[in-house]
Structures are given as structure tokens and as C-alpha cells.
Amino acid sequence: MTRQFVFSSESVGAGHPDKMADNISDAILDAILRTDPKARVACETLVKTGMVVLAGEITSHAVIDYTQVARDTILDIGYDDDGIGFDGRRCAVVLALTEQSPDISQGVDEGRGQDLEQGAGDQGLMFGFACNETDTLMPLPIQLAHHLTKRQAEVRKTGQLGWLRPDVKSQVSVRYEGLRPVALDTIVLSTQHDEAVSQATVREGVIEEIIKPVLPTHLDTTGIRFLVNPTGRFVVGGPAGDCGLTGRKIIVDSYGGTGRHGGGAFSGKDPSKVDRSAAYAARYVAKNIVASGLAEVCEVQLAYAIGVASPVSVMVNTFGTARIEEKRIECLVLELFDLRPKGIIKMLDLVRPIYRNTATYGHFGREEPEFTWEKTDRADDLLREAGPAAA
């Protein structure tokens, strides 16, 4: 009997305090990479009422005004007035930045350390995931959740709903039959708003201008619930309402709870950090496996040891949907993809100032050209090398 269940995923917009922190960290990374592609960057951000703290390790010859980068990012997000909880022009910016530890750098720099190749910047495990339930080979709940937060930002910036403020969260619950999404169950959207607007106006505006334009037409919406600002009020938002930290929305950044996560955050880290680059590579591998038709669902785990170039393990799980043995797919992955840090960086062209754009609306399932890990250019190679057994 086919199992029926409801699965939920959430997204948060750039005005959410944790996403503000991610945006600032990645904006600083981009500013450095524009001048120094060999930089080592691990930049963490904390935001709270009237204050930004930048802390971490940065080794670079780039001369960057970190304070101004933080301010510009905050203003771009929309926090430009103390009346809405934060003003990027007036907030304090505290710097606590040092250089990367030499004990770490000797294992990362090519030609140094026990493994003379460029080694992983840390130990750890990373997961990539793909499934065939959407055109982007992403799980539907997280894709719709991102569409909602992105739509809120568009409506706010155009002035279509003039009472919207930057902080926003969405959550989408989808009903499944087996592996197939069949119906929308519940949509939650909580958006910061001006104090004077009524909740009736907020509810009507959100449903008509934000939610309905992004609902897919191929799913059953009979009995769908819309929960708009379910507390009844959302005036205090952003850092005035909650402290924000880089890396605290790693499930929003990835697959919305579908598939697993190794625990390492992405934002503020240059691509020598496998927390980021290997997670992108794992998505690239998983997506190409599904795009090739070798499996309907695929999860890839990569694991690394600090200072060692090659992954210590590579695992493919297709949840019973593969057309050939999973062990054979693992062998194909090792044959066709260079999963050493240097190989990943070259394969995906990661030494570029592309990271601020990843900090909101997810790192995966995006169609912008800089998201090279979303290409399916190795699908034909996988299918060809799989041989007649995959036909």
C-alpha cells in the first residue's frame, strides 16, 4: 500500500536576522575574492539591535572596508530606519578578525603539509540531494517556501504592498502519496509589517499578492489552509526582535529537511572550506545522477579529513529507485568527478565573487548562471558509462 504523509519545509527572507548575518558574511567574502582569489576567509556575523559583530579568520592581501560592506548589505536588505528596527547607516560595527591558523593553512595550501596536494580545510561530512519531483530536481516543499519569501521581497520592493517590512518567514506543507506530491496542505507566511495596518489587510494582501501567484496549478488545493501572521501581529522584527547569527539556517539553505545535512554551514566561507564546496559538489553529483535517469531520488555523502585531498568516503543512496546497483553508481562517481578540494573548485569554478547571491532563497535549485553546481552536464556521461544495464 502506498504511504500517504505530509512533509513541511520553511524558508526565511533576507530581512530575517539569521539571513542578514549570512548576507553580510557572504558580501564580505565576495568583496575579498574580487581582489584576492587566493584568500582564506571564514567570516561570522552577529546582528542585534543597533549592532553588528564581525568575527573570524581572514588571510588576504585585499584591503577591504569591512564596516562599509556590512552597512551597504544591511541597507540593500531594507533596514534603513530605526523606526523599522535597524538602520545600516547608524549601527555600530565591531570587528574581531584574525588570520587563519598556520596549523590549518599548512594542510590546505598546495605543496605544504603531509599531503602535498591541496587538502581539505577541515574534517567533516557533507550531503547532496536531488529528486525528480520538480523541474529543478529539488523537493517541492522547500522550493515553494523559497518562492514565497522571494515573492514577499519583490512585492515589498516594488511598493505593491507598502506596509511590508523586510523580515519574513514561510512554511509549506505538502501531501504525498509515496514519492509523489499530490496536494498542498498548509501555507504559513509570517511577514513584518507597519504598525498602523490592520490584520485583515495583511491577511488579504498576503494571500492575494504573495501566496496565490506562486501556488502550482498541478496540485490539489482543496482544503488548503492559509496561516498569515498567526500570532496576530508582527511589527517588531529583524535584529530588534531576535539575535541573528551566520550559519543558523542550514536546513533552509539546503533541502528543507528532505535528505540529510552534515552540520557545516556555508556562508562566509571561501571554497577551500569543504563545508561549502563539497556540499555544492555533492549536490552536483546527486543532481546529475537523477538527471541521467539512473535514479529517481539520490543522496550523496562525502567525507573529508583535514589536510587530506581525496575524500575518505563516498556514499550514494537512491532509496530503492536506482536502475543499476548503487555500488556501480559510486564507482561511476569516482571515475567521472574530481572530488578533491582543488578539483571541486576547478570543476565548479568556485573562486569567484558569487556568494552573496546564495545567501537568500537557498543554495540549491537555482537557475542563475553562477550556480554551476546546478548544471546537469555530466548526466549523459553517467548514462553512457553505466552501459546497457541502465537502459
Curated annotation (Swiss-Prot):
SS bonds (residue pairs) = none
Cofactor requirement: Mg(2+); K(+)
Residues binding K(+): 44
- Extract one GO BP annotation from the record: one-carbon metabolic process
Which UniProt key words apply to this protein?
ATP-binding, Cytoplasm, Magnesium, Metal-binding, Nucleotide-binding, One-carbon metabolism, Potassium, Transferase
Name the positions where Mg(2+) binds. Answer: 18
Q: Which Gene3D superfamilies match?
A: 3.30.300.10
**What does the record give as its pathway?**
Amino-acid biosynthesis; S-adenosyl-L-methionine biosynthesis; S-adenosyl-L-methionine from L-methionine: step 1/1
Q: Which family does it belong to?
A: Belongs to the AdoMet synthase family.
Q: What is this protein called?
A: S-adenosylmethionine synthase
Q: Which organism is it from?
A: Mesorhizobium japonicum (strain LMG 29417 / CECT 9101 / MAFF 303099)
